[in-house]
Curated annotation (Swiss-Prot):
InterPro entries hit by this protein: DUF2746
Top-rank taxon: Viruses
Name the record gives this protein: Gene 30 protein
Organism: Mycobacterium phage D29 (Mycobacteriophage D29)
């Protein structure tokens, strides 16, 4: 009867680890690449959170709309004042 692999010295132990490593590595490498691809898409690579950026963007848009509204109100008041001068 043949006995199982029995590493008695460090070289045989190293050979055993090398054989296991060589057989497991090709199976795990595709998963590692998929995980790295997902991580690169999900990880935050900048200092500011996306939620803070969106909030800041909404504030800027609201400020722009407020300024446009104010400009239109000023123009409307000027037109009303001009019409009143013309009619008077």
């Amino acid at each position: 009867m043949t006995e199982l692999f029995n590493p008695d010295n460090p070289w045989e132990t190293a050979l055993l680890f090398f054989a296991v490593f060589c057989s497991v590595l090709p199976a795990l490498l595709p998963f590692w690449f998929k995980i790295k691809k997902i991580d690169s898409q999900v990880s935050n690579s900048h200092d500011e959170n996306l939620r803070d950026e969106i909030t800041r963007g909404f504030k800027e848009v609201r400020e722009d709309i407020r300024l446009l509204h104010e400009a239109l109100n000023i123009e409307r008041r000027e037109r009303i004042a001009g019409d009143e001068k013309r009619c008077a």
